[in-house]
Amino acid sequence: MKVFSNTHTFNYSWEEVSTANWRKYCPWNDKSTHVIAVDTLAREVDPATGILRTERLITCKQSAPEWLKSIIGGMETSQVFETSYVDPAAKTVTMVSQNITWANMVNVQETVVYRPLDAHRTQFEQDARITALCGGWQRIKSSIEDTLVTRFRENATKGKEGFECVLAMSRRVFAEEREKEKMRIEGKMMA
């Protein structure tokens, strides 16, 4: 098993980050063009805790190296099952994902947590555990795990840059909408 861990501080409030998280794979993010679809499978709020639980299926274009595709299958797309928990009281967003594609050959479990550092900054923590399940071929297992850790590292940089674009656009759009609403209310008061 190999582990990839990553942290980053976003200069946006937890409220901004937790809201923009749902738009992470939208056209505003030109770094996530590999994401073909994000399907929400289930969503519910626990009445006792107020925690929003969402299950999503994320479908991506495959970018695995050819040598790896030849070992574990040459599929063009891959799917990931994600369960997220938004806890407004504790101010945390926790996302846990598991690969569906190639699950009999490679197990990839990722956990991402967003939590506020202060009123204007949010801490991002990412932890991925990658285990190749290729029987006794330790050298091949290590090569697969090393390759996937490298991909996680590369994608972490792209993901951070893409989410920064989404956050900036979200802030701009929300500011414009607040201004429109303010003008609408002021217009009603003058009438």
Language model feature labels by segment:
Residues 15-18, 83, 125:
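Generic detector of isolated residues embedded in canonical secondary-structure elements
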Residues 1-64:
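Hydrophobic ligand-binding cavity/cleft-lining segments
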Residues 2-7, 71-76, 87-191:
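Terminal "cap-and-tail" regions of soluble proteins that handle hydrophobic small molecules
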Residues 39-97:
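Glycine-rich portal/gate segments that line the openings of hydrophobic small-molecule binding cavities
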